[in-house]
């Protein structure tokens, strides 16, 4: 270590104390935010390495600065591992985030003002899939598709009909709050039928795709984007994949010099470490357990008539619950659960009647608790504790019982072993 913990604590006690408090919070809370996970110590070590000192504009073998031989090795490791994981011919590991990966993908496929179809935010889409407050909605003419109002599932006949009407240049598939399997082959059929390109944002399900537990979009999408955290269990960052050499060139130019300068090679190194972990057979077991734990929690809610799971269940790492029969809205539920050390987020549901700042639902994810070692029994217990909290929100004695139960679970499954 160049700068050890004792040096850090002595030099900047205020910052040290803040980080220590966050470590304590993560250890003592049950983390159910679907976009969060727990990285390995190896990932943290790589991200905190001396590579943070090095500027490296460009790409391996084509840098604008000298002294890049070593970071070329680092970045090439990340690229080759990403290609191996997803069976892609080309990979760009430099995006600082999933949103920037999406921005670069758009720049590679379409022009400002072009018509694009993306999933409606309330149906499970992401801000960068055309929300008016996002650069995507402000730069391109996005037309949203929604899930079926009855089944709350993707309706490919309706999406095809809509695509034939609006004639998009690009269709964006993928979601941040959709709990069922997505058939990317059908999206490609629709795109081909109307002469559009297909882009898939698999940020939430990338770890499941990597483990072979969700169909891969890579054979069907012209460009696939993802984050490297969430179910991939890596550092916070982005990744872009394609099988098209000409698109790969456009992607590289869109990232640098298009929207980014020097890559964060310490983060690229952390991505490389996490990709090595994904290639380990143990990762497939982890991903399978994520789905099992998600289903175990969902099953508890399905047995309670006061709660409704959107689309009737889950086939991945997350699910949405309509809580409005029990509490006023999703924000109230989120705040109540914060008080008992269970962390999740309020979330809009399809055809939402409340504002995004209140919402009718909550989103529950299993990636982080699975990384800590929770199994199906513990996952069912977590769901029971959520229900107990929301149904007894004014009973302090019951809430204290929940806090004690949460403490038992977090003490039994440490965030990190010493």
From Swiss-Prot:
One of its GO terms (cellular component) is cytosol. Belongs to the SHMT family. Its cofactor is pyridoxal 5'-phosphate. GO terms for biological process: glycine biosynthetic process from serine; tetrahydrofolate interconversion. Catalyzes the reversible interconversion of serine and glycine with tetrahydrofolate (THF) serving as the one-carbon carrier. This reaction serves as the major source of one-carbon groups required for the biosynthesis of purines, thymidylate, methionine, and other important biomolecules. Also exhibits THF-independent aldolase activity toward beta-hydroxyamino acids, producing glycine and aldehydes, via a retro-aldol mechanism. The keyword Transferase applies. PROSITE patterns: SHMT. Its EC number is 2.1.2.1. NCBIfam families: PRK00011.1. Homodimer. The modification N6-(pyridoxal phosphate)lysine is found at residue 230. It is found in: Cytoplasm. It comes from the Bacteria. PANTHER family: SERINE HYDROXYMETHYLTRANSFERASE, SERINE HYDROXYMETHYLTRANSFERASE 1. The record marks 229 as: Plays an important role in substrate specificity. It catalyses: (6R)-5,10-methylene-5,6,7,8-tetrahydrofolate + glycine + H2O = (6S)-5,6,7,8-tetrahydrofolate + L-serine. This is Serine hydroxymethyltransferase. It is an enzyme of class 2 (transferase). HAMAP family: SHMT (MF_00051). The gene is glyA. GO terms for molecular function: glycine hydroxymethyltransferase activity; pyridoxal phosphate binding. Keywords: Amino-acid biosynthesis, Cytoplasm, One-carbon metabolism, Pyridoxal phosphate, Transferase. It comes from Streptococcus pneumoniae (strain CGSP14). (6S)-5,6,7,8-tetrahydrofolate binds at residues 121, 125-127, 246, 355-357. SUPFAM superfamilies: PLP-dependent transferases. Signal peptide: none annotated.
């Amino acid at each position: 270590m160049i700068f050890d913990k004792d040096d850090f604590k002595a030099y900047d006690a205020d910052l040290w104390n803040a980080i220590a408090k966050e470590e304590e919070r993560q250890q003592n809370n049950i983390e159910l935010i679907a976009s969060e996970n727990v990285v390995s110590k190896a990932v943290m070590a790589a991200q905190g390495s001396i590579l943070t000192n090095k500027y490296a504009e460009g790409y391996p073998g084509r840098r604008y600065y000298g002294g890049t031989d070593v970071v070329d090795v680092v970045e090439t490791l990340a690229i080759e591992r990403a290609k191996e994981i997803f069976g892609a011919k080309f990979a760009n590991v430099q995006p600082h985030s999933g949103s920037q990966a999406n921005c670069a993908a758009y720049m590679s496929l379409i022009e400002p003002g072009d018509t694009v179809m993306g999933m409606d935010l309330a149906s499970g889409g992401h801000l960068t899939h055309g929300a008016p407050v996002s650069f995507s909605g402000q730069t391109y003419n996005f037309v949203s598709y929604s899930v079926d109002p009855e089944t709350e599932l993707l309706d490919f006949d309706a999406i095809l009909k809509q695509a034939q009407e609006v004639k998009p240049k690009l269709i964006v598939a993928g979601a941040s709050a959709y709990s069922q399997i997505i058939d990317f082959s059908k999206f490609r059929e629709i795109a081909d039928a109307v002469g559009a390109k297909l882009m898939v944002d698999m940020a939430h399900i990338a770890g499941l795709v990597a483990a072979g537990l969700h169909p891969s979009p890579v054979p069907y999408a012209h460009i696939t984007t993802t984050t490297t955290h969430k179910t991939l269990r890596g550092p916070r960052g982005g990744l872009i994949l394609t099988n098209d050499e000409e698109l790969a060139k456009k992607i590289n130019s869109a990232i640098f010099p298009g929207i980014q300068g020097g890559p964060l090679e310490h983060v690229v190194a952390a991505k490389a470490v996490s990709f090595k972990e994904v290639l380990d057979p143990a990762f497939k077991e982890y991903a399978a357990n994520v789905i099992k734990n998600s289903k175990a929690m969902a099953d508890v809610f399905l047995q309670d008539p006061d709660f409704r799971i959107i689309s009737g269940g889950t086939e991945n790492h997350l699910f949405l619950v309509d809580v409005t029969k029990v509490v006023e809205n999703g924000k109230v539920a989120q705040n109540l659960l914060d008080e008992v050390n269970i962390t999740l987020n309020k979330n809009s549901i399809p055809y939402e009647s409340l504002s995004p700042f209140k919402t009718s639902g909550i989103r529950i994810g299993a990636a982080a608790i699975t990384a800590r070692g929770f199994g199906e029994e513990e996952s069912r217990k977590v769901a029971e504790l959520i229900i107990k909290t929301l149904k007894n929100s004014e009973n302090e004695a019951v809430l204290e019982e929940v806090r004690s139960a949460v403490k038992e679970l977090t003490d039994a499954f440490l965030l990190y072993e010493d």
